[in-house]
Amino acid sequence: DVCSSDLAGDFAKTVLMPGDPLRAKYIAETYLENPRQVNAVRNMFGYTGTYKGKEISVMGGGMGMPSIGIYSYELFNFYDVDQVIRIGSAGAFQDNIKLMDVVIGMGACTDSNYAYQYGLPGTFAPIADYELLNRAVETAKRQGTNVVVGNVLSSDVFYNAMSNVNDLWR
């Protein structure tokens, strides 16, 4: 596995996962109290510390579904993690979404065949846990953050060969 088996128990039940491992390091050093590094395999840095008294981990997930798929699978299945929350940057199809807006995914769509590997027919579109979604939205609103809730799209392709693909997904 990509994480060291010596680290079982070192991850919190909740793991925040930006794509960039250096962003994970920045988050740990800036926001966590007493952060300790729990992973450096393949330079996919992971840290555990506390935030406002709650134990939390942050670890890079890499670029694309195959990368985060491997890391999240191992966190859930080998390290007893309960929640993985993807954080970080993304593109947008809607013109009303601005830089620094917080987008909270209510449902997740894909043009990938990733779900097929798990015996799921078609393109399974998981939806968010309502309680977690509602807490995130209410917290963002209380803090005066511009928040947009809706479906998100993940793709295996970063630079698509179809020039009109963005228009088709709108």
Model-inferred region functions:
Residues 2-4:
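Short, small-residue-biased leader/transition segments that mark boundaries at the very start
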Residues 40-170:
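Glycine-rich phosphate- or other oxyanion-binding loops that anchor nucleotides, phosphorylated ligands
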Residues 6-40, 50-52:
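N-terminal low-complexity or amphipathic/hydrophobic leaders
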